[in-house]
């Protein structure tokens, strides 16, 4: 199995294994799905952290309004009355004005937070350092865990306009957002390795050979964005260590230049006649009377 270290730009994303005989059409779609799936889990975790703190989303026509404005316009949050967290709600106002402030109690909040941490760990970039490959099954498992936690805390479900429910139903609208720019459509995804595009019409082995123990750094890119930057010769960590070494060396040389003390000339090892006296047997002669 060829090991692919998938990156976006210079940032590590995940590890993935594939046989050398894999069609690049299939592999590119697979990489794009895992990449986008990880982004989906990250978006859900971010929104669920807000859900744990401030409750469900307000209706779009009530978001950003003050209590006085809501009362003046006679607006009512009907879904807020239906979607009550299990065990009762604790009021915690959302300063941004996106959520209704009816947060879950401490026990239910911990259910959400613990599940969020577990889901983050599954798709974490630290999996690269640990040598763990991320598969679509793992991404789906993380999504299922998040869905289950929401169902436990909100047995009556979430409003249809809540971004968490929309994510679970694949109805999310990311147009005009930074999150939307990060997503790469499967049909427009490209894989690059060694400054070459891995064309979908070929097999992986056409580029990396038939050695199944090969490890490559593959960069995922949106079509039309051009070739990604080449990998640096040394990593950022190695560069830091190199700079630190030269800085220490420079400081050491600087101290030696400043130290013009010649007291070392009185040391035995600095005496150029010591060897001669040693062979003549006059090494430890003292001229003073005892």
UniProtKB/Swiss-Prot annotation:
Effect annotated for changing residue 141 to G: In CILD26; uncertain significance; hypomorphic mutation
Modified residues (Phosphotyrosine): 264
One Pfam family in the UniProt entry: CFAP298
InterPro entries: CFAP298
Cellular component GO terms, alphabetical: centrosome; ciliary basal body; cytosol; intracellular membrane-bounded organelle; nucleoplasm; nucleus
Cystine crosslinks: none
Any one GO BP annotation for this protein: cilium assembly
The entry's keywords: Cell projection, Ciliopathy, Cilium, Cytoplasm, Cytoskeleton, Kartagener syndrome, Phosphoprotein, Primary ciliary dyskinesia
Keyword Transferase applies: no
PANTHER family assigned to the protein according to its UniProt record, in alphabetical order: CILIA- AND FLAGELLA-ASSOCIATED PROTEIN 298 (PTHR13238:SF0), PROTEIN C21ORF59 (PTHR13238)
Disease: Ciliary dyskinesia, primary, 26: A disorder characterized by abnormalities of motile cilia. Respiratory infections leading to chronic inflammation and bronchiectasis are recurrent, due to defects in the respiratory cilia. Patients may exhibit randomization of left-right body asymmetry and situs inversus, due to dysfunction of monocilia at the embryonic node. Primary ciliary dyskinesia associated with situs inversus is referred to as Kartagener syndrome.
Binding partners and assembly: Interacts with ZMYND10.
Protein name (Swiss-Prot/TrEMBL): Cilia- and flagella-associated protein 298
Lineage: Eukaryota, Metazoa, Chordata, Craniata, Vertebrata
């Amino acid at each position: 199995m060829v090991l692919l270290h998938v990156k976006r730009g210079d940032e590590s994303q995940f590890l993935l294994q594939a046989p050398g005989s894999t069609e690049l059409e299939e592999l590119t779609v697979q990489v794009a799905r895992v990449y986008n799936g990880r982004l989906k889990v990250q978006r859900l975790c971010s929104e669920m952290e807000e859900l744990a703190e401030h409750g469900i989303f307000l209706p779009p026509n009530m978001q950003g309004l003050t209590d006085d404005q809501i009362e003046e316009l006679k607006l009512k949050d009907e879904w807020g009355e239906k979607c009550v967290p299990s065990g009762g709600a604790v009021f915690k106002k959302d300063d941004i004005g996106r959520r209704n402030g009816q947060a879950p109690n401490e026990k239910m909040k911990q259910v959400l937070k613990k599940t969020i941490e577990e889901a983050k760990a599954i798709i974490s970039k630290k999996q690269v350092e640990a040598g763990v490959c991320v598969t679509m099954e793992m991404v789906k498992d993380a999504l299922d865990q998040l869905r289950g936690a929401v169902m436990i805390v909100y047995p009556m479900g979430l409003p249809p306009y809540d971004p968490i429910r929309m994510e679970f139903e694949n109805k999310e609208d990311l147009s005009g957002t930074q999150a939307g720019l990060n997503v790469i459509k499967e049909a427009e995804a490209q894989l690059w390795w060694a400054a070459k595009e891995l064309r979908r019409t070929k097999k992986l082995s056409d580029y990396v050979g038939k050695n199944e123990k090969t490890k490559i750094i593959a960069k995922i890119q949106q079509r039309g964005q051009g070739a990604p930057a080449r990998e640096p010769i040394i990593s950022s960590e190695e560069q830091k260590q190199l700079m630190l070494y030269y800085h220490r060396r420079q400081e050491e040389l600087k101290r030696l230049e400043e130290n013009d003390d010649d007291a070392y000339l009185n040391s035995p090892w600095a005496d150029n006649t010591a060897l001669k006296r040693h062979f003549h047997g006059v090494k430890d002669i003292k001229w003073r009377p005892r």
